[in-house]
């Protein structure tokens, strides 16, 4: 990953006063501290002792043996927390997780969209034995639990005895340290589940102090019905519920965020439901061809035509990966139809037919990037005080969100557009995110808390990742500390791996 020259130069100057990546006590001097609470920033010295923040004060006298770092002109923030990450796909093979650390992420919540490692006890043990550069917390995947009980026959509602076994498995996973239940109700493994099934499982997560995070059942024409379902789950299961990667993903709903969403938060408050959400700062998404036809009639021409139209049209849906013919990656469905000499509908049906084996084999034969959200709605979600930030990204995925989400918010939406203040953005990346998950010792800069920190230049921070180069590192993220150790220094990964497998403490409510 080639870093821009300006970043390397600034980073080199920044590091001159301390040994790179040293696991030593550190004094950060005269930083602009944005402490994660949402309050005004202030200039201060911050002392790190071991893996904890020891002192925060206007001026601190250096101690013998302490590494000094001049942070004048730079922002010091808590480490960024990604509340919806798919970086667990590949984390065991890539322990440095550079696409995450280089954008300031110190903690990520994985096991999303209904898909989690199983059993979590064993997965956590592997992380304990060979730590990564990031902290990892996990949800329990609804589809994962369904698959353990129903096997390949999960394309139907569950039976009472199956639901009972799912509840037992979920309880065991929560006891192993999971932070809640996730679902991907728009995907094959879960779309056949009833709302009552999800409620009964959410009750188990809630009883253990967990949360429910949902890729809702429809993000297109029926998105508000899907939000209604989520509110019902929260109301009846009595636990916090979170709309993940919230979007209004079809042209007929564009512009409705400001009109419709306040009523949902108000309704939730009246009904005693703790409603939350998270968002990534892009108008395009990354998923599968099959998600375009939400009732799964993949070979019904009328349904396919509607699915294409509801997602911005075939010209806005691009193959990111296509195993049967890799040369098609990067082409839109419109372009593929022209190559094949068929209609866009026929091209879609052929693409799905040639990758249907993925459903049985569990492989990843295809993926798409679709542009179907409006910038107006994305900006509204980004600015809303109850909506945290997520990448929904992978370590090495086709969507630039995996490498650019957090710098993009700071550069594009804070500095360039003024959609929200720096303090508000950092709060949503840190303190708010920690409170949503239930992390009590991270997400803020205060004495006694874990020293997960990000040092960045507010005048230059920006994302550089694109669809063409989805892993391009950002500009302006100069240093990242995890548990008192530098995992990024001078804009470069250090190779240190102090990350923890985070388990939910028993009885701690989010």
Predicted regions and their residues:
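Histidine-rich, glycine-flanked metal-binding segment
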Residues: 24, 33-79
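Divalent metal-binding pocket/active-site signature
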Residues: 172-229
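C-terminal cap of metal-dependent C-N hydrolases
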Residues: 299-301, 310, 371, 379-386, ...
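Polyanionic/metal-chelating signatures
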Residues: 123-127, 132, 143-161, 165-166, ...
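N-terminal signal peptide c-region/cleavage motif recognized by signal peptidases
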Residues: 15-19, 136
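Histidine-centered catalytic micro-motifs
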Residues: 80-90, 212-218
């Amino acid at each position: 990953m080639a870093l821009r020259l300006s970043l390397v130069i600034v980073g080199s100057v920044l590091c001159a006063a301390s040994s790179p990546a040293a696991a030593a006590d550190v004094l950060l001097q005269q930083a602009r501290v944005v402490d994660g609470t949402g309050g005004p920033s202030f200039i201060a010295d911050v002392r790190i002792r071991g893996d904890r923040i020891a002192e925060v004060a206007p001026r601190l006298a250096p101690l013998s043996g302490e590494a000094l770092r001049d942070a004048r002109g730079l922002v010091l923030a808590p480490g960024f927390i990604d509340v919806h990450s798919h970086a667990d796909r590949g984390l065991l093979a890539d322990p440095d997780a550079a696409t995450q650390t280089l954008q300031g992420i110190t903690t990520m919540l994985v096991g999303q969209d209904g898909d989690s490692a199983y059993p979590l006890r064993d997965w956590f043990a592997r992380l304990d034995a060979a730590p990564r550069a990031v902290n990892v917390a996990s949800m329990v995947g609804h589809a994962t639990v369904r698959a353990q009980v129903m096997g390949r026959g999960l394309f139907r509602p569950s039976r009472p005895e199956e639901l009972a076994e799912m509840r037992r498995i979920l309880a065991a996973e929560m006891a192993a340290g999971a932070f809640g239940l996730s679902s991907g109700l728009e995907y094959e493994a879960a779309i056949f589940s009833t709302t009552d099934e999800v409620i009964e499982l959410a009750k188990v997560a809630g009883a253990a102090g967990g949360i429910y995070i949902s890729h809702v059942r429809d993000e297109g024409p029926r998105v508000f019905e899907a939000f209604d379902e989520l509110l019902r789950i929260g109301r009846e299961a009595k636990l916090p519920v979170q709309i993940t990667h919230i979007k209004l993903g079809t042209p007929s709903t564009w512009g409705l965020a400001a009109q419709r969403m306040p009523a949902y938060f108000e309704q939730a408050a009246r009904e005693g439901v703790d409603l939350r959400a998270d968002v990534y700062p892009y108008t395009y998404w990354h998923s599968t061809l099959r998600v375009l036809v939400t009732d799964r009639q993949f070979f019904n021409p009328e349904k396919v035509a509607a699915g294409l139209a509801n997602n911005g049209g075939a010209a806005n849906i691009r193959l990111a990966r296509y195993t049967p013919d890799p040369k098609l990656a990067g082409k839109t469905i419109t372009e593929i139809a022209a190559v094949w000499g068929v209609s866009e509908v026929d091209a879609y049906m052929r693409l799905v037919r040639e990758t249907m084996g993925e459903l049985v084999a569990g492989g990843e034969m295809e993926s798409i990037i679709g542009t179907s959200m409006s910038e107006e709605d994305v900006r509204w979600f980004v600015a809303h005080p109850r909506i945290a930030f997520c990448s929904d990204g992978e370590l090495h995925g086709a969507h630039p969100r995996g490498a650019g989400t957090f710098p993009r918010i700071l550069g594009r939406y804070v500095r360039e557009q003024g959609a929200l203040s720096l303090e508000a953005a950092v709060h949503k990346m840190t303190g708010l995110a920690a409170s949503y998950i239930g992390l009590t010792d991270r997400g803020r800069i205060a004495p006694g808390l874990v020293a997960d920190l990000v040092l960045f230049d507010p005048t230059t921070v920006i994302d550089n990742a694109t669809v063409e180069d989805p892993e391009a590192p950002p500009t302006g993220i100069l240093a990242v500390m995890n548990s008192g150790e530098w995992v990024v220094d001078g804009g470069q990964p250090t190779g240190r791996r102090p990350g923890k497998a985070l388990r939910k403490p028993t009885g701690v409510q989010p």
